[in-house]
C-alpha cells in the first residue's frame, strides 16, 4: 500500500473548486461576539465574488453593511478516504452584480450579499497515493 498525500491547492484551483459547488459554510462574528457558522447556497460571479441571498430580517442580512467573513466548502469521500477543502476569506457587502443566487427558502431572497474574496487556501488529502 502506498502512502497518502496532503497537498496545498493553489488559489486558481481553490476558486475552481469553490465555483463547482453550491452550498458552503459561512463563518462570521455575531453581534454578541460569538462565531456563527451557517450553511448558505451560493454562486460565484465572473469577478470572483461569492454571492448569496437571504431574508431582510435574518441574521445574515446585516452582512450587507460590511463584515469580514470566511467561507468553507469541501468534498470528502469517507469510503475512499480522500477529499479536498477550500477556505475563502473576504469582505461581505450588498451585491449589485448580475448573478442571481437561488435561495432555497421562499422569501429568503430580499437581500443579496456578495463576498469579495481576498484570500483562498485549500488542501487535497488522500489516505492512499
PLM regions: where:
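A short mixed-secondary-structure module that forms the rim of ligand-binding clefts
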Residues: 41-78
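Extreme N-terminal tail/first-helix region
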Residues: 1-19
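Charged, amphipathic alpha-helical segments
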Residues: 7-12, 53-58, 96
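Sterically constrained small-residue positions within well-ordered secondary structures
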Residues: 17, 33, 62, 79-81, ...
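Short beta-strand segments
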Residues: 21-55
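A generic structural signal for short beta-strands and their flanking turns/coil linkers
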Residues: 22-24, 36-38, 48, 65-69, ...
Amino acid at each position: 500500500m502506498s502512502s497518502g498525500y496532503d497537498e496545498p491547492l493553489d488559489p486558481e484551483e481553490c476558486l475552481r473548486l469553490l465555483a463547482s459547488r453550491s452550498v458552503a459554510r459561512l463563518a462570521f462574528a455575531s453581534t454578541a461576539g460569538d462565531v456563527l457558522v451557517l450553511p448558505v447556497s451560493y454562486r460565484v460571479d465572473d469577478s470572483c465574488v461569492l454571492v448569496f441571498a437571504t431574508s431582510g430580517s435574518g441574521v445574515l442580512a446585516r452582512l450587507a453593511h460590511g463584515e469580514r467573513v470566511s467561507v468553507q466548502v469541501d468534498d470528502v469521500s469517507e469510503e475512499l478516504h480522500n477529499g479536498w477543502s477550500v477556505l475563502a476569506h473576504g469582505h461581505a457587502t450588498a451585491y449589485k452584480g448580475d448573478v442571481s443566487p437561488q435561495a432555497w427558502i421562499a422569501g429568503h431572497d430580499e437581500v443579496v450579499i456578495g463576498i469579495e474574496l481576498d484570500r483562498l487556501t485549500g488542501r487535497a488529502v488522500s489516505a492512499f497515493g
